[in-house]
């Protein structure tokens, strides 16, 4: 399991933990879409807060269309080291290569989502 050098920006271990915790909470609040195809749909519909991708995806090219789309739509994106850990955080028994946290104005998660978005945007600079 190796992290692909094309996976930029890669979250450090502290941020990865925060992101995975938020992904887990978002799945309880029904604010999570799992998989590259569903992440693409949320971007096209304009309901994505940010995108999380797995850096150990093989081949990584199957999700490299997402950063381009994120930049078009001005949505932050980040890579986490492990698809297995992302899958566990999503509450699925399989590895997940991509997930999208979706928008909900009345959500209890809004402050955490804003904090993570800010941290991701700092990585992109």
From Swiss-Prot:
Which Pfam families does the entry link to?
Ribosomal_L7Ae
Matching InterPro entries? eL8/uL1-like, H/ACA_rnp_Nhp2-like, Ribosomal_eL30-like_sf, Ribosomal_eL8-like_CS, Ribosomal_eL8/eL30/eS12/Gad45, Ribosomal_eL8/Nhp2
Q: What CDD domains does the database record attribute to this sequence?
A: SNU13
Key word rRNA processing present in the record? Answer: yes
Gene3D superfamilies for the chain: 3.30.1330.30
- Domain of life assignment: Eukaryota
Q: Report keywords, A-Z.
A: mRNA processing, mRNA splicing, Nucleus, Ribonucleoprotein, Ribosome biogenesis, RNA-binding, rRNA processing, Spliceosome
One GO BP: mRNA splicing, via spliceosome
Q: Which GO terms describe its cellular component?
A: box C/D methylation guide snoRNP complex; nucleolus; precatalytic spliceosome; small-subunit processome; U4/U6 x U5 tri-snRNP complex
Cite the GO molecular-function annotations of the record.
RNA binding
**Compartments reported by the entry:** Nucleus, Nucleolus
The family this protein is said to belong to: Belongs to the eukaryotic ribosomal protein eL8 family.
Q: Report quaternary structure and partners.
A: Component of the U3 snoRNP particle. Binds to the C'/D and B/C motifs in U3 snoRNA. Component of the 25S U4/U6.U5 tri-snRNP particle, a subcomplex of the spliceosome. Binds to the 5' stem-loop of U4 snRNA.
According to its UniProt entry, what is the function of this protein?
Common component of the spliceosome and rRNA processing machinery. In association with the spliceosomal U4/U6.U5 tri-snRNP particle, required for splicing of pre-mRNA. In association with box C/D snoRNPs, required for processing of pre-ribosomal RNA (rRNA) and site-specific 2'-O-methylation of substrate RNAs. Essential for the accumulation and stability of U4 snRNA, U6 snRNA, and box C/D snoRNAs.
Name by which UniProt lists this protein: 13 kDa ribonucleoprotein-associated protein
């Amino acid at each position: 399991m190796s992290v692909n050098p094309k996976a930029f920006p890669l979250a450090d271990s502290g941020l990865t933990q925060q992101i995975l915790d938020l992904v887990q909470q978002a799945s309880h609040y029904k604010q999570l879409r799992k998989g590259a195809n569903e992440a693409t749909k949320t971007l096209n519909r304009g309901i994505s807060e940010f995108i999380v991708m797995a850096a150990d995806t093989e081949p990584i090219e199957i999700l490299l269309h997402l950063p381009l789309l994120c930049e078009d739509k001005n949505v932050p994106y980040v890579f986490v080291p492990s698809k297995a850990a992302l899958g566990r955080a999503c509450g699925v028994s399989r590895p997940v290569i991509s997930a999208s946290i979706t928008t909900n104005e009345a959500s209890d998660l809004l402050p955490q989502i804003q904090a993570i978005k800010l941290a991701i945007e700092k990585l992109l600079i």
